[in-house]
């Protein structure tokens, strides 16, 4: 929800300000006046009342008064056609620009309040984005993120990702300058070990850039010094949160095949084998490190002779789990199918394997990270729009509990609840009563009033479901082990009634799944949509015949020519 609303605002705001600037120029020409003009709203503001220490205006005045053009263009806007955007939000009081550190901390303070797509981004986010439109400003923003984001704030790394993801792409010169400023190597990783926030933030920045610049730019960014720095951060002497984000950064660098080969040659798998033993550690920071280490060993940095986790995990008592075939593309799911984590910049979602249509049902979630997650119930009609920021609770077919922002979500609208913010180790309970048509949410056994809005759109076909913001993780209990806070009323559990075959329980690593896809052969006469059934149906009046009858019955227009389908004729009979 946050990312999509922020992107829409920037697009509309840039267009509106360009039109207003053009209008001002024509008015000034018509009246025969010059100089600064005053406008209202969130467009350009008058220089006379914008503050004498406005650094952007000062730079522009110096450039205009200079008789000799400067050869250094790093402080100039990257898009000279687009007018400068100096507007504040329409409700923001006029004030002098703060320093970058203050703006970053302001953004961190208000990030929990950004909940709706039509909500104005705060002044701090707008200003930071404007600063980052030049190389010099972008470098200032990045250094500030490393310098001031505190270790203890659970949304700190997510704010780093959010701000960098929405800033303009850095130029090659800016990236080169950043590597020179940071000057990272193994020795730097050992410095300031008593202040791990700087190293955590540095790794988070590197990971975000690696994800955003996958390809040649990512290869150039992973210098020998940066690789040495990240590997040094994985040593057991490091703070667990530093280890976690160094590992995530290496994962994101490995999205580029050349980087993956370089990292694999560093014997990283030997270090990860030690760290994967933390996957069930009672310390929730170490547990995150263990989860990511195990996932990397299974999916990215394979170790010769090591058995993949899915081949040895005991699933005999598990009859319901997270569905690896009903999940957005970047969510990580554990081999036992009951734990999930998101390290992408998108809003990743998943449903479980079991659907309920009647009765009273209950499941629990253990909070591993205390950031933004929307967990609850969803039908098959609920859509996963991860890149647009929509997840569970963001349509009329789902309802979700958000313990970080203390909200209940339904149909992309939120309302506050009275529970305190959740924290690591908390247990959230989810009760679905289809007899009374109500949902009840619990935090450590304390229940909220029932929620009934979703039943105006649907009354059956519910799955347990969840959506995750960046760097969030939780564990699900569908009844395979005793609940910590079972409700007083009689209920059923997924694990008592669900059934999965041994094959359906397997959650394959991505390289194994890709290998299976490469082995799939598609017949010449198969349906062009499902690639499963024989293409035996002709559409009228257009005459196209590349579909099976099952797919043709679901269409109103031909997918090839877009003509309306009047009738469907089966051409041949076949044995499926």
Swiss-Prot record:
SMART domains: RING, SPRY. One of its GO terms (cellular component) is cytoplasm. GO terms for molecular function: ubiquitin-protein transferase activity; zinc ion binding. The lineage of its organism: Eukaryota, Metazoa, Chordata, Craniata, Vertebrata. Residues 300-483 form the B30.2/SPRY domain. One of its GO terms (biological process) is proteolysis involved in protein catabolic process. Glycans are attached at residue 314. It is found in: Secreted. The gene is RSPRY1. The keyword DNA damage does not apply. Residues 50-99 are annotated as: Disordered. InterPro entries: ARM-type_fold, B30.2/SPRY, B30.2/SPRY_sf, ConA-like_dom_sf, RNF123/RSPRY1-like, SPRY_dom, SPRY_RSPRY1, Znf_RING. PANTHER family: RING FINGER AND SPRY DOMAIN-CONTAINING PROTEIN 1, RING FINGER AND SRY DOMAIN-CONTAINING. A zinc finger (RING-type) spans 527-562. It comes from Pongo abelii (Sumatran orangutan). Disulfide bonds: none annotated. This is RING finger and SPRY domain-containing protein 1. Residues 1-16 form the signal peptide. Keywords: Glycoprotein, Metal-binding, Phosphoprotein, Secreted, Signal, Zinc, Zinc-finger. Residues 57-68 have a biased composition (Polar residues). Residues 83-97 have a biased composition (Basic residues). The modification Phosphoserine is found at residue 50.
């Amino acid at each position: 929800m946050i990312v999509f609303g922020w992107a829409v605002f920037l697009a509309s705001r840039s267009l509106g300000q360009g039109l207003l600037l053009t209008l001002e120029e024509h008015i000034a020409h018509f009246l025969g006046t010059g100089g600064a003009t005053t406008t209202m709203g969130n467009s350009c503001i008058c220089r006379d009342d914008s503050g004498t220490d406005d650094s952007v205006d000062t730079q522009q005045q110096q450039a205009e008064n200079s008789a000799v053009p400067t050869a250094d263009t790093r402080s100039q806007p990257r898009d000279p056609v687009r007018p400068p955007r100096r507007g504040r939000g329409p409700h923001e009081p006029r004030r002098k620009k703060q320093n970058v550190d203050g703006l970053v901390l302001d953004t961190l303070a208000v990030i929990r309040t950004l909940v709706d797509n039509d909500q104005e981004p705060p002044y701090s986010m707008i200003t930071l984005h404007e600063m980052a439109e030049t190389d010099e400003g972008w470098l200032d923003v990045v250094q500030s993120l490393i310098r001031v984001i505190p270790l203890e704030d659970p949304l700190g790394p997510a704010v780093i990702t959010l701000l960098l993801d929405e800033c303009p792409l850095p130029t090659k010169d800016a990236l080169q300058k950043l590597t020179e400023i940071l000057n990272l190597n193994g020795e730097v990783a050992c410095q300031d070990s008593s202040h791990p926030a700087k190293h955590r933030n540095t790794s988070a920045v590197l990971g975000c850039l690696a994800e955003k610049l996958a390809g040649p730019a990512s290869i150039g960014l992973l210098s020998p010094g940066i690789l040495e720095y990240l590997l040094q951060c994985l040593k057991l002497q490091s703070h667990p949160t530093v280890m976690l984000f160094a590992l995530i950064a290496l994962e994101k660098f490995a999205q580029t095949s050349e980087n993956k080969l370089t990292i694999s040659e560093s014997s990283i798998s030997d270090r990860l084998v030690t760290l994967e033993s933390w996957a069930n550690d009672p310390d929730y920071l170490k547990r995150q490190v263990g989860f990511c280490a195990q996932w990397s060993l299974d999916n990215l940095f394979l170790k010769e002779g090591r058995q993949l986790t899915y081949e040895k995990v005991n699933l005999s008592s598990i009859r319901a789990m997270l569905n690896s075939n009903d999940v957005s593309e970047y969510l990580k799911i554990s081999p036992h199918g009951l734990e999930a984590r998101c390290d992408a910049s998108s809003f990743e979602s998943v449903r479980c394997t079991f659907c309920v249509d009647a009765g009273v049902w209950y499941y629990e979630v253990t909070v591993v990270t205390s950031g933004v997650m929307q967990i609850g119930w969803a039908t098959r009609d609920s859509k996963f729009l991860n890149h647009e920021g929509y997840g569970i609770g963001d349509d009329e077919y789902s309802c979700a509990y958000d313990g970080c922002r203390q909200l209940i979500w339904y149909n992309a609208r939120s309302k506050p609840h009275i529970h305190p913010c959740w924290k690591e180790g908390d247990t959230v309970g989810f009760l679905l009563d289809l007899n009374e048509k109500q949902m009840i949410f619990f935090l450590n056994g304390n229940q909220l009033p029932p929620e009934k809005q979703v039943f105006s759109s649907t009354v059956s076909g519910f799955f347990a479901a969840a959506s995750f913001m960046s760097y969030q993780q939780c564990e699900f209990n569908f009844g395979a082990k005793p609940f910590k806070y079972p409700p007083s009323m009689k209920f059923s559990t997924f694990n008592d009634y669900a059934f999965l075959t041994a094959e359906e329980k397997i959650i394959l690593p991505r390289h194994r799944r890709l290998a299976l896809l490469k082995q799939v052969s598609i017949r010449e006469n198969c349906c062009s949509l499902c690639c499963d059934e024989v293409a035996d149906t002709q559409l009228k009046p257009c005459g196209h015949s590349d579909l099976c009858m099952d797919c043709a019955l679901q269409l109103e227009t031909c997918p090839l020519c877009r003509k309306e389908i009047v009738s469907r004729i089966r051409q041949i009979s076949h044995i499926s």
